[in-house]
Amino acid sequence: MITAEYLNNFFLGYLPYVALTVLATGLIYRTIRRNNTIQASSSQFISNDKSLRWGSTLFHYAILLVLLGHILGLLTPEWLYNWFMTNETKRLLAILMGSISGAAALVGITLLVVRRFSNKRVWATSKIQDYVIVVLLLVQISLGLWCTYITTQSSLEDYMGMEYWAQGIFIFEPDSWKYIADADLIYKLHIVNGFLIFIIFPFTKLMHMIMVPVLYAIDHFRK
C-alpha cells in the first residue's frame, strides 16, 4: 500500500536528486554538442511581434528574479542572514518580491503561451516538449503565486521548514522531506512541478535562456 510517507519520501526526497542530475547532465551534453537548435531558437526573439517582445521581456527578467529569490531565499544559511534581518523580515521580503516578480512572470508567460498556440509559424516549428514546458511554466508560476498567498496566512515555522528542506537536500541530509511533510499540498505541487520542469528543460528550446549567453562567452573568450 502506498502511504503518505512513501509519497513524501519519493517526491520530496528522491525526485530532487533525479531532476538535478538530469538537468546538469542535459546542460553539459547540450553545451558540448552545441546543438544548433539552441542558437536558432533565439532568433524567435528578434521580431516585430509586440506580444512576443512584451511577453519575452517580462518573462525572462521576472523569471530570473524568481530564480534568484528562490536560490537566495532557500539556500542562504539562517545564521548568515540573521546578521542583518530576522526570519520574519525575510519572510515579508520573500512575499513582497515573490508577488511582484511572480505577477510579472505570469503576465509574460501568458502572452507567450497564447502566441505559441495561436501563431501558425511558431506552431509549425515547435515540438511537443516545447508546448509541455510552457504549460508547465504557466502552472508553476500560478502555483508559486498561490504559495505566496498561503505564506501570508501560514506560520513562520511553516515558512522556515521550506528553507530547512532545501538546504537538507543540498547537504544530502537523510529524511529532509520531513521538514515539509505537513506542508500545504499547493507547496508540494509547486515543488514537484518545478522538478518536472528541470527534467525536461534541457530538451526544449528554452535552453537558449542559459546556453546562448554561455556559448557567446565561450566564443568571445576563444577569439
PLM features: residue spans?
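Hydrophobic transmembrane alpha-helical segments in integral membrane proteins
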Residues: 1-23
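Membrane-embedded alpha-helical bundles of multi-pass integral membrane proteins
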Residues: 16-23, 27-29, 41-196, 201-204, ...
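Membrane-proximal N-terminal segments immediately preceding the first transmembrane helix
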Residues: 1, 36-43
